[in-house]
Amino acid sequence: RDRLRSRGLGDVYKRQGDLYVIESTSPVGTTEAMARIIFGERPELESKIFIAYCPERVLPGNVIYELVHNDRVIGGLNPESTEKAIAFYSQFVQGTLHKTNCRTAEMCKLTENSSRDVQIAFANELSLICDKAGINVWELINLANKHPRVNILQPGCGVGGHCIAVDPYFITADFPAESKLISDARDINNYKSFWCAEKVK
């Protein structure tokens, strides 16, 4: 808190009616925490500025297209902030803008990447089992996916990219007792990298 306060968050105010949006992946409660710091330093700003959270949903290398065409989840500090953010994003986003509150929007981003992590962990764990059982995991997954309601991902050496390997920790750190599956998935995917390295040796 002191470190954030030293950066003068209250000084971000320019004029009444300004909108401030957080897009970075953040723990649940970040938007509210930032608002408390700002209004703690500058109480006269309360109800005069708008604060919202809208997680980015873009793929590197295709940023402009996805920025325009992807659906967005927008959650304000209050209903007025949500509407203000909707009005801003509607100027350039052609996808659907889904309204919610800031805590749900924050959790939505963490859920998206944690869901991918869990799905990848299942495929990776399956590959470990198949290695022990003498079964071709690629053939197995291909056959299992013939079922109309089964869609197993392909196993690999953990997970790719930066976000998926990091974002689940925002959930497990704040809700350790309730996030055992998410935590186990992280362990499996981390272990798979070392397992693959040993196989190469």
How should each PLM-predicted stretch be described?
Residues 15-19, 46-47:
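A short helix->loop->beta-strand "cap" motif at the edges of active sites that frequently abuts
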Residues 1-13:
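Single conserved hydrophobic/aromatic residue that forms the stacking wall/gate
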Residues 21, 51-52, 182:
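Structural detector of well-ordered beta-strand residues that form the stable sheet scaffold
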Residues 17-32:
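Conserved Rossmann-fold NAD(P)-dependent oxidoreductase catalytic core, especially the SDR/UDP-sugar
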Residues 36-54, 58-150, 178:
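Internal alpha-helical scaffold of NAD(P)-dependent oxidoreductase catalytic cores
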Residues 24, 75-78, 112, 116, ...:
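Hydrophobic alpha-helical scaffolding
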Residues 32-33, 166:
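Generic recognition of short, well-ordered alpha-helical segments
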Residues 83, 120, 131-201:
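NAD(P)-dependent Rossmann-like dehydrogenase/reductase catalytic/cofactor-binding core
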